[in-house]
A protein has these predicted regions:
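Short hydrophobic/alpha-helical segments at membrane-entry points of transmembrane helices
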Residues: 92-98, 203-204
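Extracytoplasmic gate region of multi-pass secondary transporters
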Residues: 202-241
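Extracytoplasmic
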Residues: 7-37, 218-223
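Short hydrophobic/small-residue motifs within alpha-helical transmembrane segments
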Residues: 47-49, 137-138, 245
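Cytoplasmic helix-loop-helix junction between adjacent transmembrane helices
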Residues: 97-135
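Conserved MFS/SLC helix-loop-helix module at the cytosolic interface between two early adjacent transmembrane helices
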Residues: 53-92
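Juxtamembrane intracellular "pre-TM" segments in multi-pass secondary transporters
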Residues: 177-205
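Helix-loop-helix hairpin linking two adjacent transmembrane segments in secondary transporters
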Residues: 93, 122-124, 130-176
Length: 245
């Protein structure tokens, strides 16, 4: 498989880690910023809100931009947002950083999939996209537990600092490995929105919404639940997160 796919996989690993790692760091963040666990949990909501807002805007508003330039620019937004989170002096700045870092989420996955599929022959496109998204799966298995452990042992700011560094590494990797790719001149907002006329698209969206919604009701507060209900230590919580993921 082309090396560019591994650059994209590194990006999905970084994005997946920053999306979910907050759930394991809620007690640490709440204690450090002197806010309640429920209020801290809104940092997860803020990220999700940024994804919902950013995905269509970033995707539809950038169809005219060279795809290599776009992917690197999206990772720059990611680095900025996580950098703000790492150095946030208060809750408001941390929330702002979370929202900023989430704006590129959907666009990176969407554009990355198109770019990844275009790197290989048609018969290998499914495998190429799977390789790219393997970074997301690995982020849940390794990135989130490791980020939780680092955050609980050395401070949650370090976790976001390292995630920001991963984003920077991804941007550099893409800049050297990926060739310029012209945007689709036939693609436009009207053409992109036409997909919403399909009932199956809405069914898929509903399935995702209700399925993940049910999971995240509990998953968002899994660390404080385990900490208060079972008395588990930070290391034990990290192990539980690894097993669950």
């Amino acid at each position: 498989m082309p090396i560019q796919l591994y650059a994209l996989a590194l990006g999905t690993f970084a994005v997946g880690t920053t999306e979910f790692v907050m759930m394991g760091l809620l007690p640490s963040v709440a204690s450090d910023l002197a806010v309640s666990i429920p209020v801290t949990g809104l940092l997860v909501t803020g990220y999700a809100l940024g994804v919902v807002i950013g995905a269509p805007i970033m995707t539809l508003g950038t169809t005219h931009i060279d795809r290599k330039t776009l992917l690197i620019s999206l990772m720059a937004v990611f680095v900025l947002g996580n950098g703000l989170a790492a150095f946030a002096p208060n809750y408001a700045v941390l929330m702002f950083g979370r929202i900023i870092s989430s704006l590129m989420h959907g666009a990176f996955f969407g554009v990355g999939s198109v770019v990844g599929a275009g790197l290989v022959p048609k018969e290998k496109q499914a495998r190429a996209i799977a390789l790219m998204f393997s970074g997301l799966a690995i982020s849940n298995i390794i990135g989130v537990p490791l980020g939780t452990y680092i955050g609980q042992m050395f401070g949650w700011r370090l976790s976001f600092g390292l995630i920001s560094a991963l984003g920077l590494l991804t941007a550099l990797f893409l800049s050297f490995a990926l060739k310029p790719q012209a945007a689709d001149p036939l693609s436009g907002i009207k053409q992109e929105l036409a997909v919403l006329k399909r009932a199956r698209v809405w069914l898929a969206l509903a399935t995702t919404t209700f399925g993940f919604g049910g999971v995240f009701v509990v998953w968002t507060y899994i660390a404080p639940i385990l900490e208060t209900a079972t008395g588990l230590t930070p290391i034990a919580i990290t192990i539980v997160l690894f097993i669950i993921n």
